[in-house]
Design a protein with these regions (language model features):
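Structured, basic alpha/beta domains of bacterial-type, RNA-associated proteins
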Residues: 1-23, 27-111
Length: 111
């Protein structure tokens, strides 16, 4: 049985989120939670919250032991980009891109 959780419009760049996602792909849910809790990257907090949500979704659907769940698929897609203008010297300006991403996490029971 698969359980899915999606975090949309996360205010973190897709590149930085992928750095964390690539480290937890294929791990068991319990190991990944522990791994994410002590990871120094900002993206780890987003992923930890998302993983807890996916585990809760699995428990809601069917009585499942979280330790028997494994991360089957996880990926990061680019979301919309907010553009801001930063004034510079001599009447110029720079565009600051505040990137967002959509993170998808799919859990499945280990056989």
């Amino acid at each position: 049985m698969e359980s899915k959780a999606i975090l949309r419009y996360a205010r973190i760049t897709p590149r930085k989120a992928r750095r964390v996602v690539n480290l937890i792909r294929g791990k068991s849910a319990g190991d990944a939670l522990l791994f994410l809790h002590f990871m120094p990257y900002r993206g780890a907090k987003f992923l930890e919250k998302l993983l807890k949500s996916a585990i809760a979704n699995a428990e809601q659907k069917k009585a499942v032991n979280p330790e028997s769940m494994k991360i089957v698929r996880t990926f990061v897609d680019q979301g919309p980009v907010m553009k801001r203008v930063e004034p510079r010297a001599m009447g110029r300006s720079n565009v600051i891109r505040k990137r967002t991403c959509h993170i998808t996490l799919v859990l499945s029971e280990e056989e």
